[in-house]
Amino acid sequence: MLKTVRAARRPPLALRLAPTIVPLLMLRFAAAGLAAQSAAVEESRARADVSAVLDALHEAASEADFDGYFSLYAGEAVFLGTDATERWTREAFMDYTRARFETGTGWTYHMLERHVSIAPNGRTAWFDERLENANLGETRGSGVLVLEDGRWKIAQYNLTIPIPNEMAREVARRIRALKGG
């Protein structure tokens, strides 16, 4: 009589591969975690570097340090002042600033609060900061920096004077009257 031999049942494929796949998945997740930590560290470092550039900008301005001040701007930078007509290219702003700085007179703004964001590509940053100035009171600076040759440079700086909402209509009316409208 023939004896029927049953083949031993093999465990399912997933169970057979588990000893190989599980360690690989663990390594993958660990690597992903390290990459995320590394990206967070890089972003934090970039934010600190951008903040240092802005601190240096305000320090150079208060010391009337022309070369130091403009070394922080990108070649195609634009400065927007508090007046609606004040839109200066870097060169025009240099012309405006040179005479004042040569007399040893700059301008002093003390940073009260600052927020810096870094684009996912790590090469562009934008910021807003609340500032205090003896003549203008509280002002706001905002702008964009770009990473050029490993250094953050200001591509645009916009200085404004925030107006409380309760005063906005009156201020707008006075501006229109000043312009003859």
Q: Locations of the language-model features?
A:
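Short beta-edge strand/loop motif at the mouth of beta-sheet-based domains
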Residues: 88-90
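Surface-exposed, charged secondary-structure patches
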Residues: 42, 49, 79, 92-138
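Bacterial N-terminal signal peptides
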Residues: 16-30
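Hydrophobic pocket/interface hotspot
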Residues: 57, 69-70, 77, 93, ...
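Short, low-complexity N-terminal intrinsically disordered segments enriched in polar/charged residues
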Residues: 27, 32-75, 123, 166-181
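Short beta-strand edge/turn micro-motifs at domain boundaries
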Residues: 138-169
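Solvent-exposed loop/turn segments at secondary-structure junctions
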Residues: 76, 84-86, 131-134, 159-162
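N-terminal secretory signal peptides that target proteins for export/translocation
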Residues: 1-15
